[in-house]
């Protein structure tokens, strides 16, 4: 926050960015993140189920499986003419077969790693430098010499958690017994 407020100035007058505009920018950053996250989860779950060997999916059409998933991952039910799978090339021709979830998982790891810097207090240069050194000595230095999970655990001191991503997206953990859908 302080960094942006110190450098953001009007190009003609030199007036600093007002606090209320900073708040608007922050709110805009997370606008529709819930819908975007549902969309990515829809893609990832569809990919995993279509590439699954589970018997519960045997004999079902791919589109039927996707529409069942849509019951919990979309706000608006897909129309009958929706042939989304015909153009979802990532999972059929793009090398992501059963791997589309890695997009969202990368966001989880990134947010969780960044939260360690936040926990060190971004305004505390000494703590941020120490955390940066730890990042350099683990994630950047070890690279592929260990499994990614082991490298992450060495940096973070624990397994990855989704809490930081949920927070950074401006979402909260709430329980809804039944999905709310627009039909």
Segments from the language model and where they lie:
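Cation-handling catalytic/transport regions enriched in His/Asp/Glu
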Residues: 1-173
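Conserved small/polar residues in nucleotide/adenosyl-binding loops
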Residues: 174-180
């Amino acid at each position: 926050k302080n960094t942006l407020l110190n450098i953001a100035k009007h190009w003609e007058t030199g007036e600093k960015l007002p606090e209320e505009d900073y708040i608007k920018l922050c709110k805009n950053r997370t606008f529709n993140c819930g819908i975007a996250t549902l969309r990515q989860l829809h893609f990832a779950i569809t990919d995993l189920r279509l590439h699954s060997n589970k018997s519960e999916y045997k004999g079902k059409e791919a589109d039927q499986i996707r529409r069942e998933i849509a019951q919990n991952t979309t706000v608006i039910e897909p129309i009958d003419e929706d042939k989304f799978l015909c153009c979802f090339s990532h999972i059929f021709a793009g090398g992501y077969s059963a791997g589309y979830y890695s997009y969202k998982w990368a966001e989880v790891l990134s947010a969780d790693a960044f939260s360690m810097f936040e926990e060190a207090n971004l305004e505390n240069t000494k703590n941020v430098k120490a955390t940066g050194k730890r990042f350099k000595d683990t994630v950047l230095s070890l690279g592929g010499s260990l499994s990614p999970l082991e490298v992450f655990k060495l940096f973070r001191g624990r397994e990855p958690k989704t809490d930081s991503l949920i927070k950074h997206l401006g979402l909260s953990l709430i329980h809804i017994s039944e999905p709310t859908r627009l039909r």
